[in-house]
Design a protein with these regions (language model features):
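A short, conserved alpha-helix in the catalytic core of glycosyltransferases
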Residues: 1-17
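Phosphate/oxyanion-binding loops and surfaces in catalytic or ligand/nucleic-acid-binding neighborhoods
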Residues: 4, 19, 46-50, 174
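A short, charged/proline- and glycine-enriched loop
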Residues: 68-81, 104-105
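Extended catalytic core of nucleotide-activated donor transferases of GT-like folds
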Residues: 81-87, 91-100, 104, 109-185
Length: 185
């Protein structure tokens, strides 16, 4: 579809569930599964050009591979919470920044300092193709996350003085990203 010049859309809220071996077992030496090995070779042969230019090898840099951002610059935006653009001017500003960064072709990540999943606005950002980090699994782990993924960040926008103060040191220590600051008021 892409090769034909068509737009490809995906649904960020979609879920793929796969139970390996439930339908036909796991033995590739017999039965229907015996075709799996041959079909895998045919698949790689058919899609070799695409896999070689637009994809990374298996398990190489999943941060970039999972959202096909191999050839894009990545920006991480950090603000105090998921913006609510119809409720306050600061949120409106950040919302516009996020959408504009996406329109510029950047791979956009958003880290709300409070890590709260706003059921309305988080989903809207995700529908725009913006990855939003939230939940207990990230609590107290910003520095660790930046240490692990900092090499993939080209820009970091820190919003508001108290947010910048809390997040600047790990960004400087673990990335070569250009740091931007937006102070609001």
């Amino acid at each position: 579809v892409r090769a034909a010049g068509k737009r490809v859309l995906y649904q960020p809220a979609s879920v793929v569930i796969h139970y390996e071996g439930i339908s036909h077992g796991t033995d590739t030496g017999s039965g229907v599964k015996a075709h799996q090995v041959d079909n895998q070779k045919k698949f790689y042969k058919r899609w070799a050009d695409e896999l070689g230019t637009r994809h990374l090898d298996n398990a190489v840099n999943p941060f970039r591979a999972r959202d096909r951002s191999i050839h894009q610059k990545t920006i991480l935006v950090v603000d105090h919470y998921v913006p609510q653009p119809d409720r306050d001017a600061g949120s409106r500003s950040i919302w516009c920044f996020l959408r504009e960064f996406k329109a510029m072709g950047l791979n956009v990540k958003f880290w709300p300092a409070n890590l709260w999943h706003d059921p309305q606005y988080t989903a809207l950002l995700q529908q725009e193709g913006i990855e939003v980090y939230y939940g207990n699994e990230y609590a107290g782990r910003f520095a660790e996350w930046v240490q692990e993924h900092g090499a993939n960040l080209d820009y970091v926008l820190l919003s508001r003085p108290h947010v910048a103060q809390e997040h600047l040191d790990p960004v400087r220590a673990h990335t070569r990203a250009k740091v931007l600051f937006y102070g609001h008021d």
